Amino acid sequence: GYLNLEKEIPASPLSAFRIASMTKSFTAMAIIKLRDEGKLSLNDPVSKYVPEMSKLTYLTKDAPTIDIENLLTMTAGFPEDNPWGDRQLDEPDEMLIDLVDEGISFSNIPSYGYEYSNTGYALLGHIVSKVSGMSYQDYITQNIFKPLGMDHTYWEYEGIPEDQLAIGYR
Protein backbone atom coordinates (compact mmCIF):
# COMPACT_ATOMS: atom_id res chain seq x y z
CA GLY A 1 0.00 0.00 0.00
CA TYR A 2 0.83 3.64 0.04
CA LEU A 3 1.76 5.99 2.82
CA ASN A 4 0.43 8.75 0.59
CA LEU A 5 -1.64 7.66 -2.39
CA GLU A 6 -1.66 11.06 -4.10
CA LYS A 7 2.14 11.37 -4.02
CA GLU A 8 2.58 7.61 -4.59
CA ILE A 9 4.81 7.26 -1.53
CA PRO A 10 4.94 3.54 -0.67
CA ALA A 11 4.44 2.27 2.86
CA SER A 12 7.48 0.83 4.60
CA PRO A 13 8.19 -1.08 7.83
CA LEU A 14 8.62 2.34 9.49
CA SER A 15 5.19 3.59 8.37
CA ALA A 16 2.72 4.43 11.13
CA PHE A 17 -1.02 3.91 10.64
CA ARG A 18 -3.81 5.30 12.78
CA ILE A 19 -5.55 2.57 14.79
CA ALA A 20 -9.02 4.16 14.50
CA SER A 21 -11.75 1.51 14.70
CA MET A 22 -9.17 -1.26 15.12
CA THR A 23 -9.30 -0.31 18.80
CA LYS A 24 -12.53 -2.31 18.87
CA SER A 25 -10.54 -5.51 18.27
CA PHE A 26 -8.21 -4.66 21.14
CA THR A 27 -11.18 -3.78 23.36
CA ALA A 28 -12.77 -7.15 22.60
CA MET A 29 -9.48 -8.89 23.41
CA ALA A 30 -9.30 -7.04 26.73
CA ILE A 31 -12.85 -8.01 27.67
CA ILE A 32 -12.18 -11.68 26.84
CA LYS A 33 -8.91 -11.57 28.82
CA LEU A 34 -10.74 -10.15 31.84
CA ARG A 35 -13.41 -12.83 31.41
CA ASP A 36 -10.75 -15.55 31.25
CA GLU A 37 -9.25 -14.17 34.47
CA GLY A 38 -12.67 -14.47 36.14
CA LYS A 39 -13.03 -10.71 36.60
CA LEU A 40 -16.25 -10.41 34.62
CA SER A 41 -18.77 -12.49 32.71
CA LEU A 42 -20.08 -11.84 29.22
CA ASN A 43 -23.54 -12.32 30.73
CA ASP A 44 -23.04 -9.54 33.28
CA PRO A 45 -25.51 -6.70 32.83
CA VAL A 46 -23.68 -3.56 31.73
CA SER A 47 -25.40 -1.73 34.61
CA LYS A 48 -23.17 -3.73 37.01
CA TYR A 49 -20.26 -1.57 35.79
CA VAL A 50 -22.17 1.47 34.53
CA PRO A 51 -25.04 1.99 37.00
CA GLU A 52 -26.48 4.79 34.85
CA MET A 53 -27.46 2.11 32.30
CA SER A 54 -30.20 0.92 34.65
CA LYS A 55 -32.10 4.17 34.00
CA LEU A 56 -32.39 3.66 30.24
CA THR A 57 -35.85 3.29 28.76
CA TYR A 58 -36.04 0.34 26.36
CA LEU A 59 -38.40 0.13 23.39
CA THR A 60 -40.60 -2.43 25.16
CA LYS A 61 -41.22 -3.23 28.82
CA ASP A 62 -40.14 -6.85 28.36
CA ALA A 63 -36.88 -6.07 26.53
CA PRO A 64 -33.86 -7.96 27.85
CA THR A 65 -31.26 -6.03 29.81
CA ILE A 66 -28.10 -5.13 27.89
CA ASP A 67 -25.19 -7.36 28.83
CA ILE A 68 -21.51 -7.29 27.95
CA GLU A 69 -22.02 -9.79 25.14
CA ASN A 70 -24.55 -7.42 23.54
CA LEU A 71 -21.93 -4.67 23.50
CA LEU A 72 -19.29 -7.01 22.05
CA THR A 73 -21.58 -8.24 19.27
CA MET A 74 -23.15 -4.83 18.60
CA THR A 75 -26.60 -6.15 19.47
CA ALA A 76 -27.37 -3.74 22.34
CA GLY A 77 -29.99 -1.99 20.22
CA PHE A 78 -28.13 1.31 19.93
CA PRO A 79 -28.58 3.13 16.61
CA GLU A 80 -25.65 3.17 14.20
CA ASP A 81 -25.76 6.95 14.01
CA ASN A 82 -24.96 7.20 17.68
CA PRO A 83 -24.13 10.34 19.64
CA TRP A 84 -20.67 9.22 20.78
CA GLY A 85 -19.18 8.78 17.33
CA ASP A 86 -15.60 7.58 17.25
CA ARG A 87 -14.32 7.07 20.76
CA GLN A 88 -12.23 10.06 21.75
CA LEU A 89 -9.56 8.60 24.01
CA ASP A 90 -8.60 12.00 25.37
CA GLU A 91 -12.16 12.66 26.55
CA PRO A 92 -12.80 11.68 30.16
CA ASP A 93 -15.06 8.71 30.88
CA GLU A 94 -17.31 11.14 32.74
CA MET A 95 -18.44 12.54 29.39
CA LEU A 96 -19.49 9.05 28.28
CA ILE A 97 -21.30 8.46 31.58
CA ASP A 98 -23.05 11.84 31.21
CA LEU A 99 -24.20 10.75 27.74
CA VAL A 100 -25.66 7.55 29.20
CA ASP A 101 -27.20 9.47 32.10
CA GLU A 102 -28.96 11.79 29.64
CA GLY A 103 -30.45 8.74 27.93
CA ILE A 104 -29.50 6.78 24.83
CA SER A 105 -32.06 6.08 22.14
CA PHE A 106 -32.66 2.59 20.78
CA SER A 107 -33.26 1.37 17.26
CA ASN A 108 -33.83 -2.25 18.32
CA ILE A 109 -34.57 -4.32 21.38
CA PRO A 110 -31.29 -5.68 22.82
CA SER A 111 -30.28 -9.04 21.27
CA TYR A 112 -32.66 -8.70 18.30
CA GLY A 113 -30.53 -6.98 15.68
CA TYR A 114 -27.02 -5.91 14.75
CA GLU A 115 -26.03 -2.27 14.36
CA TYR A 116 -22.46 -0.98 14.32
CA SER A 117 -21.92 0.88 17.58
CA ASN A 118 -19.12 3.15 18.69
CA THR A 119 -21.10 3.88 21.85
CA GLY A 120 -21.17 0.20 22.80
CA TYR A 121 -17.42 -0.12 22.42
CA ALA A 122 -16.82 3.10 24.33
CA LEU A 123 -18.83 1.52 27.16
CA LEU A 124 -16.69 -1.63 26.91
CA GLY A 125 -13.57 0.53 27.17
CA HIS A 126 -14.99 2.06 30.33
CA ILE A 127 -15.68 -1.43 31.70
CA VAL A 128 -12.08 -2.49 30.93
CA SER A 129 -10.83 0.49 32.90
CA LYS A 130 -13.22 -0.03 35.80
CA VAL A 131 -12.60 -3.78 36.15
CA SER A 132 -8.81 -3.60 35.68
CA GLY A 133 -8.27 -0.51 37.81
CA MET A 134 -6.11 0.94 35.01
CA SER A 135 -6.77 3.49 32.31
CA TYR A 136 -8.00 1.90 29.09
CA GLN A 137 -4.83 2.91 27.23
CA ASP A 138 -2.52 1.59 29.94
CA TYR A 139 -4.39 -1.72 30.14
CA ILE A 140 -4.30 -2.28 26.37
CA THR A 141 -0.64 -1.26 26.15
CA GLN A 142 0.52 -3.48 29.03
CA ASN A 143 -1.73 -6.49 28.45
CA ILE A 144 -2.08 -6.63 24.67
CA PHE A 145 0.45 -4.49 22.80
CA LYS A 146 3.54 -5.40 24.86
CA PRO A 147 2.90 -9.18 25.05
CA LEU A 148 2.28 -9.22 21.29
CA GLY A 149 5.51 -7.31 20.60
CA MET A 150 3.59 -4.33 19.19
CA ASP A 151 6.35 -1.93 20.17
CA HIS A 152 5.56 0.58 17.44
CA THR A 153 1.87 0.99 18.24
CA TYR A 154 1.01 4.46 19.50
CA TRP A 155 -2.05 6.18 20.94
CA GLU A 156 -0.91 9.67 19.98
CA TYR A 157 0.73 10.62 16.71
CA GLU A 158 2.28 13.99 17.55
CA GLY A 159 5.76 12.48 17.99
CA ILE A 160 5.75 10.51 14.74
CA PRO A 161 7.62 12.17 11.85
CA GLU A 162 5.17 13.37 9.20
CA ASP A 163 6.96 11.38 6.48
CA GLN A 164 6.21 8.15 8.38
CA LEU A 165 2.52 8.78 9.17
CA ALA A 166 0.14 7.23 6.65
CA ILE A 167 -2.81 9.19 5.36
CA GLY A 168 -6.09 7.42 6.07
CA TYR A 169 -8.38 6.72 3.13
CA ARG A 170 -11.96 5.44 2.95
Protein language model features and the residues they cover:
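Short linear capping/connector segments at secondary-structure termini
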Residues: 2-4, 14-15, 45-54, 85-88
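Short, glycine/proline-biased beta-turn/loop segments that scaffold the active-site neighborhood
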Residues: 42-59, 146-148
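Active-site SXXK
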Residues: 18-43, 121-129
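Short, conserved catalytic-motif segment at the N-terminal edge
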Residues: 1-19, 39, 93, 101-105
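Short, surface-exposed loop or secondary-structure junction motifs
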Residues: 2, 58-170
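Generic hydrophobic/packing signal
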Residues: 30-35, 50, 72-79
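Catalytic tyrosine of NAD(P)H-dependent dehydrogenase/reductases that use a Tyr as the general acid/base
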Residues: 17-20, 114-116
